[in-house]
Amino acid sequence: SGSVLVHPRQTAIWTPPAKPETLVIDDLLPHFGDDFPPLFILGVGGAPMDPMNNLSAALRHHGIALEVMSTPAACRTWNVLMSEGRNAVTGLYDIA
């Protein structure tokens, strides 16, 4: 078990900060490569307590929308988006 980053064609182990609210754009951009996704879904474990406005603004600067939700909801959303053929990346915090 652990946190993962899921791209449309690959999944990678991810070591984000222990607290999702301390996540910053520099924790993410190196994992996106040269082709930034239009959407980043962040599954924060349990119910999100922080709207993560600073991270959202930083991602928007790169043309990436941010959706923050529980990890189970992020998994469901990811599955729907992939079934629709959409491009997105999801970061899933391990559920403690």
Feature-to-residue mapping (PLM):
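A polyampholytic, Gly/Pro-enriched intrinsically disordered region
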Residues: 84-96
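A short, acidic, amphipathic alpha-helical segment used as a generic capping/interface helix at domain edges
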Residues: 22-34
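Glycine-rich nucleotide phosphate-binding loop and flanking beta-alpha elements
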Residues: 12, 47-48, 96
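Conserved mixed alpha/beta catalytic, RNA-binding, or beta-rich assembly cores of soluble enzyme
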Residues: 1-25
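Structural motif
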Residues: 5, 40-41, 89-92
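Mid-chain, well-packed structural core segment of small domains
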Residues: 31-68
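Long, charge-dense
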Residues: 71-82
